[in-house]
């Protein structure tokens, strides 16, 4: 088995999907989890205005609405959380995403004060954060807020990770990578667009340039610029297509060096890191 085949198998990626079937699969998956643990009453997700959180948010709201109708449990709710750092440049996209999702509840937690306070506390301890590390601080602060909300609403935190993100490890460890349940796992980027199109999402929300937008020195830095490959390259790789060797090597390089992000904390029984 080639490394490409191993990666495809590990991430559950498929070359072709039926969008309607995958929508139903994700919604039923979320519902089944909540039904298994009836003490859980909410799904919590940060909404950024980008493709991934818009899709995960819509699927979460659909799952909650269906489960509420089926069980009569009106305590069930989907909580969409806005988590800007100060003023977000693409705030209108966030509002458009909220309008499309129509969540049961919307909360806004501005993380700037908490991030600056943490940075100052570290500075007083003799640690000056780089812009890159400060970006990770933002991602972790966002997740901390979501877990606090979930803790107070008997909820679980929904993740936005998918195959095209997992393969490169393009997420913050214990930030946006630290979630309870990931309904998009297995899908590549273009497949996520297919699901949103099938759901009637406004096109600008899934055709916009993907960006983590974490670094102050490089605001709105496109994911593809940071990775050195395009999402079309990554999707083609995940669909089993043959790529230019240099591009394939870059993708596989990301996969190998970010393996630790896709695993639980390393123990004496692990040996993947010895490769």
Swiss-Prot record:
Residues of the signal peptide: none
Species per Swiss-Prot/TrEMBL record: Salmonella schwarzengrund (strain CVM19633)
Function: Catalyzes the ATP-dependent amidation of deamido-NAD to form NAD. Uses ammonia as a nitrogen source.
Keyword terms of this UniProt record: ATP-binding, Ligase, Magnesium, Metal-binding, NAD, Nucleotide-binding
Record's protein name: NH(3)-dependent NAD(+) synthetase
Sequence positions that bind Mg(2+): 52, 165
Highest taxon in the source lineage: Bacteria
Xref: InterPro entries: NAD/GMP_synthase, NAD_synthase, NH(3)-dep_NAD(+)_synth, Rossmann-like_a/b/a_fold
EC number: 6.3.1.5
GO BP terms, alphabetized: NAD biosynthetic process
